[in-house]
Amino acid sequence: MEEGKMDENEWGYHGEGNKSLVVAHAQRCVVLRFLKFPPNRKKTSEEIFQHLQNIVDFGKNVMKEFLGENYVHYGEVVQLPLEFVKQLCLKIQSERPESRCDKDLDTLSGYAMCLPNLTRLQTYRFAEHRPILCVEIKPKCGFIPFSSDVTHEMKHKVCRYCMHQHLKVATGKWKQISKYCPLDLYSGNKQRMHFALKSLLQEAQNNLKIFKNGELIYGCKDARSPVADWSELAHHLKPFFFPSNGLASGPHCTRAVIRELVHVITRVLLSGSDKGRAGTLSPGLGPQGPRVCEASPFSRSLRCQGKNTPERSGLPKGCLLYKTLQVQMLDLLDIEGLYPLYNRVERYLEEFPEERKTLQIDGPYDEAFYQKLLDLSTEDDGTVAFALTKVQQYRVAMTAKDCSIMIALSPCLQDASSDQRPVVPSSRSRFAFSVSVLDLDLKPYESIPHQYKLDGKIVNYYSKTVRAKDNAVMSTRFKESEDCTLVLHKV
């Protein structure tokens, strides 16, 4: 960052989550990420700097090692002129969603993270004058718990995402249950992956967004019908996938465009050869537990037809989905097995609070921290060291379960044969693409009790709902058989 030349008019609002806000530069492929805090919570500049530096270090020393340097962009901490930050804050305020304005942008420290703009291709520093499409997917957890510590039988049959959908709809978070099941996407089977991606497109919730030239064109819009959304989306995408033919508008055109998009995303997700160290986890973390979620609509529809769900074809080991799944599976014990170990660490810290720094709970996230994560033993020797390792592995696994994958696509130019970037074909065109991961902040140690309570809540609600539905079905069948009258006619 060239501090003396910062102009707030060159930056625009890009988006925000619960803990940070992002602005993007108009010409350069960079974004600034600022922390957000409730109005009454004051942090010193040093604390904010350390918080941001920890995020950078964790990305650089841990997630880059697991996922590969081509996928992980950890950025750097920068110090900005306070006047620039204040003016920027005023400029973007009107663009912020009302639901996010309960927290304020940090305008006092001057610190932010500078990162590449992942809605652009990750090969050029400046925005190219060609159209760019970016699909952001939050794939969620791709396996069913295999730990013997799991006490709820349902957790061995139905994935966390599918169970959580029922609770989210009941509490009004979403209007309807999504047909998406992460196990279908992570299966490596193209038929199941296509179904998963179409389901995400039908009910995006906050798990799918599409950007065109850096601008959000498709995401969670509760008030609008999926049909209207799809036709509008197809209008945006048609020039990418059918650049020169006169494909008419209407349902046929919409279906053709969506099909092309789904096929291209699938090919990109199955591609890749970036070297990460996640392979070091695979001997202990092979595919365990069921490979199919009983609640997946894809699996249910096949069962109704008397067919078996296609097994996972297996993800290529170089692809990002495979590596992400490996890191997710560092959750070796499930939250049920992990929570007693968290309590062991807590008791130790109550007795020796000064040890918190030595245990690296709040960092530093360095090579030593990373090396301890590679211990995949599940034999509890009763020590604090064992408990701490499992707690840290769980935090890293939860981070991988909540990360987002960014796929940037740009139509290849006629003279692009010398281009060094990877290319994916569609029916009528070819795309240069890049794949990146974001949302890689380490999950807080303090959130573990909340995760334990939430897990129980999700499973109990799902079990109750499913039991009620099953009882209703059985009751209807019994009633039908009761009401049935056999009439014999003389012949």
UniProtKB/Swiss-Prot annotation:
A GO biological-process term: inositol phosphate metabolic process
Catalysed transformations (reactions): 1D-myo-inositol 1,3,4,5,6-pentakisphosphate + ATP = 1D-myo-inositol hexakisphosphate + ADP + H(+)
Localisation: Cytoplasm; Nucleus
Record-listed E.C. numbers: 2.7.1.158
Segments carrying motif EXKPK motif: 136-140
Tissues expressing the protein: Ubiquitously expressed, with high expression in heart, brain, testis and placenta.
Residue numbers of Phosphoserine PTMs: 282
InterPro entries on file: Ins_P5_2-kin, IP5_2-K_N_lobe
Molecular function terms, GO-annotated: ATP binding; inositol-1,3,4,5,6-pentakisphosphate 2-kinase activity; molecular adaptor activity
Main subcellular localisation: cytoplasm
One Pfam family from the record: Ins_P5_2-kin
Sorted UniProt keywords: ATP-binding, Cytoplasm, Kinase, Nucleotide-binding, Nucleus, Phosphoprotein, Transferase
Role of this protein: Phosphorylates Ins(1,3,4,5,6)P5 at position 2 to form Ins(1,2,3,4,5,6)P6 (InsP6 or phytate). InsP6 is involved in many processes such as mRNA export, non-homologous end-joining, endocytosis, ion channel regulation. It also protects cells from TNF-alpha-induced apoptosis.
Protein name: Inositol-pentakisphosphate 2-kinase
Species: Homo sapiens (Human)
Gene designation per UniProt: IPPK
